[in-house]
Amino acid sequence: MAALVVSETAEPGSRVGPGRGRISRGRLANQIPPEILNNPQLQAAVQALPSNYNFEIPKTIWRIQQAQAKKVALQMPEGLLLFACTIVDILERFTKAEVMVMGDVTYGACCVDDFTARALGVDFLVHYGHSCLVPMDTSVQDFRVLYVFVDIRIDTAHLLDSVRLTFAPGSSLALVSTIQFVSTLQAAAQELKAEYHVSVPQCKPLSPGEILGCTSPRLPKEVEAVVYLGDGRFHLESVMIANPNVPAYRYDPYSKVLSREHYDHQRMQATRQEAIAAARSAKTWGLILGTLGRQGSPKILEHLESRLKGLGLPFVRLLLSEIFPSKLSLLPMVDVWVQVACPRLSIDWGSAFPKPLLTPYEAAVALKDISWQQPYPMDFYAGNSLGPWTVNHGRDPGPRGLGQPASGKVQQGFRGQSPAPACEGCSCADLKAALPAS
């Protein structure tokens, strides 16, 4: 499913609006002209892409044509880059646009790089593989962003059989995943509800069941196990950190293996508390604003600056797209670093740095704004978060009405982030309305 960041007016009598359900796939498809949907040459060209990956080529072509875009940029995680040249060929063949691939690393939805795209003269950015996490200004009308989630179809029957062989009937299970597999996750949850107490938790503004490496929900005490659908451990570790007492399992849809997973919570927490303790004696602080796409939050940076100024602590600012120990070692006068980029960089790799490398939350603990939390909070993008050291803290979570900014989705360029969740009113919000948390 894709989400276009551009305001769209609802059809007369439509049920679009807060709490009114979603636009059906059929209606969305009907908005694409039949000469695109039924074009035999386009259908043949799309066969060059894997059939179980939904790159939404017809919709992308239609949106490019609607926007009358002349220069289009494609941004995608490295796992999808092998399909980039094929997509470029298709889009250039069936539109009048010049299409380029942005090759800088894309770790997640926080890395959507509209700044670089617009600096290159791009008027339409297609971001693949992530949901609409970062809100952008809607006032500039010469730039559009289309999010293509790249829904991946897998062998759902094997997933269901694996769960049934592993867990006794009546068990209380929580199911989570990344955006690519959320549709499959919901289908699996519906199938399993006859035999298990199944929940699909939600950490707003994410979709039900969706987790990020830095943002995961706290699970109710009655949950006996959490099952993550996806490859790798990065996202899974997020929900494990947030729920240290819940046994975690991972179903890899590629290897078709359901495995029990473990995490050394004691070691992680001891390492992070040691870094915080060292920071409390620091004389000079360094504040890093991540510049990889929209990874850095100016709002959090401003909060940290305000706190350090109030305490009379000197600090330096550093802008970095990627943070390496060798780079920070060039500034030996800094005693402690706080990176406003990716919390997992500190959690996973902080011990590799010569000086303490704190997350904004850990900086708040070091400055005694908050006590150490148990469990460790994974709420960096959560709407309901602990404090101003998180991205969406204090923002109005209420839904926007029709015709108000960010209905549809143009996320555009101002350096701050808009005062409401990213997904209100766009087709990503339609997805969330269709996938109720349970």
Curated annotation (Swiss-Prot):
Keywords: Cytoplasm, Iron, Iron-sulfur, Metal-binding, Nucleus, Phosphoprotein, S-adenosyl-L-methionine, Transferase. It is an enzyme of class 2 (transferase). [4Fe-4S] cluster binds at C110, C214, C342. It comes from the Eukaryota. The modification Phosphoserine is found at S418. Pathway: Protein modification; peptidyl-diphthamide biosynthesis. GO terms for biological process: fibroblast proliferation; protein histidyl modification to diphthamide. NCBIfam families: diphth2_R. Component of the 2-(3-amino-3-carboxypropyl)histidine synthase complex composed of DPH1, DPH2, DPH3 and a NADH-dependent reductase. Interacts with DPH2. Interacts with RBM8A. Catalyzes the first step of diphthamide biosynthesis, a post-translational modification of histidine which occurs in elongation factor 2. DPH1 and DPH2 transfer a 3-amino-3-carboxypropyl (ACP) group from S-adenosyl-L-methionine (SAM) to a histidine residue, the reaction is assisted by a reduction system comprising DPH3 and a NADH-dependent reductase. This is 2-(3-amino-3-carboxypropyl)histidine synthase subunit 1. The lineage of its organism: Eukaryota, Metazoa, Chordata, Craniata, Vertebrata. The gene is DPH1.
